């Protein structure tokens, strides 16, 4: 109905949305770090192994070179943008078998930190030393690897417009001018997101 100037999304626009004239303006990128309890000796998973853990096809760390311990699968609640992006990036939407679903990132971090054998996922910006980040296909989750595209678990933060930014009102153009300014980019980095390569 074109009553909104800017529509925010924590995922890429679909082809259907683009066909309706929406322009995908990526303003930031969020890396999704897979984390495990610090006692776990496994440091790297393939994308396929990660998908199999979350769908219940791999249930013990010994099958991945770790100790003989059940994998405790922790995730976010249904409707979470992080969960939606994580499952979509792995191609496992609506197939996950969670031992526990938690309503906030901090709770996932705390649960994985205190639960032996656990695995979870959080936004890169909250990653701390209470847990161990897992490499994905040999790539460490970091701002650098998200920015250069080598780390696969990442999602764009999009501000969609009806048509190109240059076709928008002066007020809308001013919003994007600020976002793309040095001050705007500093804010994006300060909140823990990665600025896209321009």
Regions found by a protein language model. Give the residues of each.
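Exported/periplasmic ABC-transporter solute-binding proteins
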Residues: 1-198
């Amino acid at each position: 109905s074109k009553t909104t100037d800017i529509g925010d999304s924590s995922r890429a626009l679909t082809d259907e949305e683009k066909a309706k004239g929406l322009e995908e303006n990526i303003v930031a990128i969020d890396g999704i770090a897979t984390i495990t309890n610090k006692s776990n000796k496994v440091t790297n998973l393939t994308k396929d192994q990660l998908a199999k853990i979350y769908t219940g096809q791999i249930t013990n760390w010994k099958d991945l070179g770790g100790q003989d311990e059940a994998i405790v699968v922790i995730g976010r609640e249904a409707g979470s943008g992080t969960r939606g992006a994580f499952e979509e990036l792995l191609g496992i939407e609506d197939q996950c078998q969670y031992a526990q679903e938690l309503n906030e990132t901090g709770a996932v971090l705390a649960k994985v930190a205190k639960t032996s054998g656990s695995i979870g996922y959080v936004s890169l910006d909250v990653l701390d030393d209470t847990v161990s980040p897992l490499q994905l296909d040999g790539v460490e989750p970091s701002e650098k690897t998200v920015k250069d595209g080598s780390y696969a678990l990442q999602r764009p933060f999009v501000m969609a417009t009806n048509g190109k930014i240059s076709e928008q009102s002066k007020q809308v153009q001013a919003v994007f001018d600020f976002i793309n300014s040095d001050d705007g980019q500093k804010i994006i980095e300060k909140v823990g997101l990665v600025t896209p390569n321009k």
